Amino acid sequence: MKQLRLEPVVQVRGEINIPGSKSISNRALLLATLAKGTTTLTNLLDSDDIRHMLASLKQLGVGYRLSQNNTVCELTGLGGAISADTAQTLFLGNAGTAMRPLCAALTLGRGEFTLTGEPRMEERPIGDLVDALKQLGANIMYLKNEGFPPLTINATGLNGGDVEIAGDLSSQFLTALLMVAPLAKGSVNIHVKGELVSKPYIDITLALMAQFGVQVINHDYARFEILAGQQYVSPGKVLVEGDASSASYFLAAGAIKGGEVKVTGVGRLSIQGDVKFADVLEKMGADIEWGDDYIIARGAPLTAVDLDMNHIPDAAMTIATAALFAKGTTTIRNIYNWRIKETDRLAAMATELRKVGALVEEGHDYIQITPPAVLNTAEIDTYNDHRMAMCFSMMAFADCGITINDPDCTSKTFPDYFAQFASLKA
């Protein structure tokens, strides 16, 4: 197994241009596919999740051209649903942002489609989405365990009508349903059951749908109306914002050991909720400066916070490791959906934080972290989870440094993360 040793860093300073957002990249690729016209996507993320989506689209007959560095994609839309004359099997790795939307999109046309992935994907639930699609007439069959991939879709199109979908596990289910609803045979009325988690991710979806010419009537996130007869039309160009979750590590670095760190590609005008991570750092005592398309974090003594972070679940992980450098006990609440991500992130985070000496209380949907007087070095297991590897890079700011096991798992969203991180040393 590959290991990466991070030696202690005294101070950080610098500027990082954040690679494209995973959430926006895969949503935009799918909408461009369903749209009429050719779309040029710039600052597309070049990572495993996006490669799985692109490979699947190519297999389904979608035409596109990629630039040499894979960050510009010119894609010719189908002007409607995806159909196939022969049965197709698509391998989607551990890419939830490809599995969920494609599962929904492939019900719209005609054909037989089987969706598979890595072993971890077979543990990531999809039942809430499938149940909703079945209410609109979809024919979907599980191949192993009820409620989980792999699955086979026999597509004949989606009916309109009323549909209920659970909102309390993952916003990706609602996102997938919203994106396909305009191409159903009639108007669709979506009722959200339970508390909707990660609302800002729904805002990303609605903003992109509007960019492609489709309007959704949002009744305070409890009900969504999508009128029949709408069509996605390419806006011509789509600029993919920098990934706000990826920005969180560099902003935390600036807060803990700045100096001053500036991230570009996200800012005040961002459509991603995870930029609110900077507000949490500010509450902890960091000096934060906002621009339209940049955020600057400067170092200051940090103090613990006790916050509901349901709205920023991915970036909240960075707070868990930043808490090691804050005075007092930090509590991160309402984050049950950490448990159904690339790994059970609540259990994984608690285990690894204890290795470096933290006192940790792990609850059903919260984590409480009290830093030790002196942090210990350790070998951090990353659970094939890109965010675990990036979060624990913060331990480079302890006097003992840290060893990261399987550092290349960052390829899911940020292949050159550790090279960029190293560039910040003052």
UniProtKB/Swiss-Prot annotation:
Residues that, per the record, bind phosphoenolpyruvate: 22, 96, 124, 172, 345, 387, 412
Residues the record lists as binding 3-phosphoshikimate: 22-23, 27, 170-172, 198, 314, 337, 341
Family according to the record: Belongs to the EPSP synthase family.
HAMAP family in alphabetical order: EPSP_synth (MF_00210)
Organism: Shewanella sp. (strain MR-7)
Lineage, uppermost ranks: Bacteria, Pseudomonadati, Pseudomonadota, Gammaproteobacteria, Alteromonadales
Annotated function: Catalyzes the transfer of the enolpyruvyl moiety of phosphoenolpyruvate (PEP) to the 5-hydroxyl of shikimate-3-phosphate (S3P) to produce enolpyruvyl shikimate-3-phosphate and inorganic phosphate.
Active-site residue list: 314
Keywords for this protein: Amino-acid biosynthesis, Aromatic amino acid biosynthesis, Cytoplasm, Transferase
Principal subcellular localization: cytoplasm
Entry-linked CDD domains: EPSP_synthase
Name this polypeptide is given: 3-phosphoshikimate 1-carboxyvinyltransferase
GO biological process, one term: chorismate biosynthetic process
Recorded GO CC terms: cytoplasm
EC top class, as a word: transferase
Catalytic activity: 3-phosphoshikimate + phosphoenolpyruvate = 5-O-(1-carboxyvinyl)-3-phosphoshikimate + phosphate
